[in-house]
Design a protein with these regions (language model features):
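Active-site HxH/HxHxD metal-binding segment of metal-dependent hydrolases
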Residues: 1-68, 154-158
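Metallo-beta-lactamase
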Residues: 42-46, 68, 74-161
Length: 161
Protein backbone atom coordinates (compact mmCIF):
# COMPACT_ATOMS: atom_id res chain seq x y z
CA UNK A 1 0.00 0.00 0.00
CA UNK A 2 1.05 3.56 -0.65
CA UNK A 3 -0.04 7.02 0.41
CA UNK A 4 0.90 9.16 -2.59
CA UNK A 5 0.43 12.90 -2.88
CA UNK A 6 0.30 14.78 -6.18
CA UNK A 7 1.46 17.89 -4.30
CA UNK A 8 1.86 19.27 -0.80
CA UNK A 9 -1.19 21.48 -0.29
CA UNK A 10 -3.29 20.98 2.83
CA UNK A 11 -6.50 20.00 1.03
CA UNK A 12 -4.74 16.92 -0.34
CA UNK A 13 -2.87 15.97 2.83
CA UNK A 14 -4.79 16.96 5.96
CA UNK A 15 -5.88 13.34 6.51
CA UNK A 16 -2.31 12.02 6.47
CA UNK A 17 -2.21 11.81 10.28
CA UNK A 18 -5.29 9.56 10.39
CA UNK A 19 -4.01 7.32 7.60
CA UNK A 20 -0.68 7.02 9.39
CA UNK A 21 -2.38 6.10 12.70
CA UNK A 22 -4.72 3.58 11.07
CA UNK A 23 -2.45 1.99 8.46
CA UNK A 24 1.12 3.08 9.26
CA UNK A 25 1.48 4.76 5.88
CA UNK A 26 3.52 7.92 5.44
CA UNK A 27 3.16 10.11 2.35
CA UNK A 28 5.25 9.72 -0.77
CA UNK A 29 5.67 13.13 -2.38
CA UNK A 30 7.95 14.97 -4.79
CA UNK A 31 11.05 16.25 -3.05
CA UNK A 32 10.26 19.87 -3.99
CA UNK A 33 7.02 19.73 -1.98
CA UNK A 34 8.44 18.07 1.14
CA UNK A 35 8.50 21.41 2.97
CA UNK A 36 4.81 21.97 2.22
CA UNK A 37 3.98 18.82 4.20
CA UNK A 38 5.49 20.48 7.25
CA UNK A 39 3.20 23.52 6.91
CA UNK A 40 -0.23 21.87 6.53
CA UNK A 41 -1.65 23.70 9.56
CA UNK A 42 -0.32 27.08 8.45
CA UNK A 43 -1.71 26.57 4.95
CA UNK A 44 -5.17 25.71 6.27
CA UNK A 45 -5.23 28.74 8.55
CA UNK A 46 -4.03 31.12 5.82
CA UNK A 47 -6.26 29.85 3.02
CA UNK A 48 -9.53 28.92 4.76
CA UNK A 49 -9.11 29.97 8.39
CA UNK A 50 -9.20 26.38 9.64
CA UNK A 51 -7.21 25.26 12.65
CA UNK A 52 -5.72 21.83 11.98
CA UNK A 53 -4.13 20.70 15.21
CA UNK A 54 -2.67 17.37 14.16
CA UNK A 55 0.80 15.92 14.01
CA UNK A 56 1.42 15.13 10.37
CA UNK A 57 3.86 12.36 9.49
CA UNK A 58 7.01 13.24 7.58
CA UNK A 59 7.41 11.95 4.04
CA UNK A 60 8.38 8.31 3.76
CA UNK A 61 9.75 8.62 0.23
CA UNK A 62 10.80 11.67 -1.76
CA UNK A 63 10.01 11.31 -5.44
CA UNK A 64 11.63 12.58 -8.63
CA UNK A 65 10.90 12.46 -12.37
CA UNK A 66 10.54 8.89 -13.72
CA UNK A 67 10.40 7.22 -10.30
CA UNK A 68 7.87 4.40 -10.22
CA UNK A 69 5.23 3.35 -7.72
CA UNK A 70 3.69 -0.09 -7.99
CA UNK A 71 0.16 -0.99 -6.94
CA UNK A 72 -0.15 -4.73 -7.47
CA UNK A 73 0.55 -5.29 -11.17
CA UNK A 74 0.13 -1.60 -12.02
CA UNK A 75 3.17 0.64 -12.37
CA UNK A 76 2.77 4.41 -12.15
CA UNK A 77 5.54 6.70 -13.37
CA UNK A 78 6.13 10.08 -11.74
CA UNK A 79 5.93 12.96 -14.22
CA UNK A 80 6.98 16.33 -12.84
CA UNK A 81 4.34 19.02 -13.48
CA UNK A 82 5.41 22.06 -11.45
CA UNK A 83 3.40 25.26 -11.46
CA UNK A 84 0.51 24.83 -9.04
CA UNK A 85 3.22 23.91 -6.55
CA UNK A 86 6.97 23.41 -7.00
CA UNK A 87 6.68 19.63 -6.69
CA UNK A 88 3.40 18.96 -8.45
CA UNK A 89 3.29 15.62 -10.28
CA UNK A 90 1.20 13.36 -12.48
CA UNK A 91 1.14 9.65 -11.63
CA UNK A 92 0.87 7.97 -15.04
CA UNK A 93 0.10 4.31 -15.75
CA UNK A 94 0.79 3.70 -19.43
CA UNK A 95 -0.70 0.18 -19.42
CA UNK A 96 -4.03 1.45 -18.08
CA UNK A 97 -3.88 4.75 -20.02
CA UNK A 98 -4.66 6.75 -16.90
CA UNK A 99 -3.03 9.57 -14.94
CA UNK A 100 -3.77 11.15 -11.59
CA UNK A 101 -3.28 14.82 -12.41
CA UNK A 102 -3.64 16.43 -8.99
CA UNK A 103 -4.27 20.17 -9.28
CA UNK A 104 -2.21 20.71 -12.43
CA UNK A 105 -5.03 20.16 -14.92
CA UNK A 106 -8.79 19.97 -14.43
CA UNK A 107 -11.68 19.50 -16.82
CA UNK A 108 -11.78 22.89 -18.56
CA UNK A 109 -9.32 24.60 -16.25
CA UNK A 110 -5.94 24.50 -14.50
CA UNK A 111 -4.63 24.79 -10.96
CA UNK A 112 -4.10 28.13 -9.25
CA UNK A 113 -0.62 29.59 -9.17
CA UNK A 114 -1.10 32.28 -6.53
CA UNK A 115 -0.14 30.07 -3.57
CA UNK A 116 3.39 30.13 -2.15
CA UNK A 117 5.71 28.45 -4.66
CA UNK A 118 3.22 28.63 -7.52
CA UNK A 119 4.40 29.74 -10.96
CA UNK A 120 2.27 30.41 -14.02
CA UNK A 121 5.40 30.19 -16.16
CA UNK A 122 6.20 26.70 -14.83
CA UNK A 123 2.57 25.60 -15.12
CA UNK A 124 2.44 26.63 -18.79
CA UNK A 125 5.64 24.64 -19.41
CA UNK A 126 4.07 21.63 -17.68
CA UNK A 127 0.90 21.95 -19.76
CA UNK A 128 2.94 22.05 -22.99
CA UNK A 129 4.64 18.80 -21.97
CA UNK A 130 1.37 17.18 -20.86
CA UNK A 131 -0.30 18.06 -24.17
CA UNK A 132 2.08 15.66 -25.91
CA UNK A 133 0.65 12.66 -24.04
CA UNK A 134 -1.74 10.41 -26.03
CA UNK A 135 -5.27 11.82 -26.42
CA UNK A 136 -6.76 8.67 -24.89
CA UNK A 137 -5.08 9.12 -21.51
CA UNK A 138 -7.84 9.42 -18.90
CA UNK A 139 -7.14 12.13 -16.33
CA UNK A 140 -8.31 11.87 -12.74
CA UNK A 141 -7.82 15.36 -11.28
CA UNK A 142 -7.59 16.33 -7.63
CA UNK A 143 -10.95 18.13 -7.89
CA UNK A 144 -13.89 17.71 -10.25
CA UNK A 145 -14.82 15.20 -12.94
CA UNK A 146 -12.51 12.99 -14.95
CA UNK A 147 -11.45 14.04 -18.41
CA UNK A 148 -8.82 13.08 -21.00
CA UNK A 149 -5.80 14.63 -22.66
CA UNK A 150 -7.67 14.79 -25.98
CA UNK A 151 -10.70 16.45 -24.37
CA UNK A 152 -8.53 19.09 -22.70
CA UNK A 153 -6.42 19.83 -25.77
CA UNK A 154 -9.63 20.29 -27.77
CA UNK A 155 -11.63 22.35 -25.24
CA UNK A 156 -9.48 23.70 -22.40
CA UNK A 157 -8.36 27.28 -23.17
CA UNK A 158 -5.13 26.80 -21.19
CA UNK A 159 -3.69 23.84 -23.10
CA UNK A 160 -3.00 23.18 -26.77
CA UNK A 161 -0.47 21.53 -29.04
Amino acid sequence: MHLVATHGHFDHNFGNDTIYKEFGLKPEIHRKDERLLQTIGDQAMTIVGANIDAEMPAADRLLSENDTIEFGSHKFVVIETPGHSPGGVFYYCKEENVAFSGDTLFKGSIGRTDFVGGSMFMLIQSLRMISQMPDEVKLLPGHGPETSIGEEVAHNPYIDR
